[in-house]
Design a protein with these regions (language model features):
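N-terminal Sec/SRP start-transfer signal
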Residues: 1-32, 50
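Alpha-helical transmembrane segments
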Residues: 28-58
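Peri-transmembrane interface segments
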Residues: 36, 240-248, 252-296
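A short beta-strand structural signal in non-transmembrane regions
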Residues: 56, 162-163, 224-246, 262
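A structural signal for hydrophobic secondary-structure junctions
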Residues: 61-66, 71-223
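Structural beta->alpha junctions
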Residues: 66-67, 197-199, 230-239, 267-270
């Protein structure tokens, strides 16, 4: 039967060639669009998880209630003990602390006087601990446009738009002005290790990255963390597994009335991710459905 159909197509090209070409092109378009949409979603989930949310996230209840403000005065104290419990109960997950905060970055001239100042948003991650995957997770090696990644305490990475606007170069000494978790003024000097470009306007406009040990000294947050991120094995987000871990952890804390007790969320709970991914999946389905109807 198959041989008969092939002979018919070859011998009568005027009738068979156009349908074959149309169907072939249609299948290619469907496969391409499906792969494109899937790739875009995977990239969005990966970027959001690595920089903003994690696959899982632990914070205090008070912090979670005002999470958008990143209120470090409501941060998780005794984060080392909490992480020990997390590693013990969910050993397959890579747990790592993060701190988000803002301040002013002061750039001096050759005489040590202030040449320029600009507001920055800082993210502190565990970049120097042995075995930490944070530098790779944030893609720092690929993002470096000048200088090098953080290799020792007292170093900082500056986003490219900020660096170009204020003339910051690798090797420069800068001063960060901010406030401690208790509201007191604080400042610290850092050496600019490198300039980074992430290809994301929000990150590139005025972001800095430093090691979490330096941030804890600056913010007077010894053994504290604003948030603890959790990443599932293989850095691959699995909604059902993440939901199971979240439910298990929150069940353990259900009888604790303290507003500073830890609470866990997962990626789909954050920043309208569930609605965004659901909408995108629906759009992808309808696009493919329309193409299939048009080709039938």
């Amino acid at each position: 039967m198959f041989s008969f159909i092939c002979k018919g197509i070859i011998r009568d090209r005027r009738r068979s060639l156009l349908p074959v070409v149309v169907v072939t092109i249609g299948v290619m378009v469907v496969v391409f669009l499906d792969g494109l949409m899937g790739g875009m979603m995977d990239n969005m989930v990966r970027m959001t998880a690595n920089f903003q949310i994690g696959h899982l996230k632990v914070m205090t209840r008070a912090y979670a209630a005002d999470e958008a403000q990143k209120p470090n005065d409501l941060a998780l104290l005794g984060s080392g003990e909490v992480m020990e419990q997390l590693h013990r109960d969910y050993p397959e997950v890579d747990w790592t602390p993060r701190i988000f905060f803002g301040g002013l970055l002061d750039i001096p001239d050759e005489h040590g006087e202030t040449k320029a100042q600009g507001p920055v948003t800082a993210q502190a991650a565990d970049l120097l601990s042995e075995g930490s995957k944070e530098a790779a997770r944030l893609g720092l090696e690929k993002a470096i446009t000048a200088g090098h990644i953080i290799t020792q305490p007292g170093e900082i990475l500056v986003s490219i738009d900020f660096a170009e606007s204020f003339g910051v170069k690798p090797g420069d000494r800068v001063t960060f002005f901010g406030s401690t978790m208790d509201g007191a003024m604080s400042f610290a000097n850092y050496h600019v290790a490198g300039i980074v470009r992430f290809g994301n306007s929000m990150l590139d406009r005025g972001g800095v990255i430093l090691d979490i040990a330096d941030a804890r000294l600056l913010l007077d947050m010894e053994d504290a963390a604003g948030e603890i991120f959790g990443f599932l094995p293989g850095e691959k987000y699995l909604k059902e597994r993440a939901e199971s871990i979240k439910t298990s952890f929150n069940h353990q804390q259900a009888d604790n009335p303290d507003v500073y007790a830890p609470v866990m969320t997962q990626l789909m709970d954050q920043d309208m991710m569930r609605q965004t991914l659901g909408y995108t999946d629906s759009m992808s389905f309808f696009m493919l459905l329309l193409l299939m109807i048009a080709l039938s």
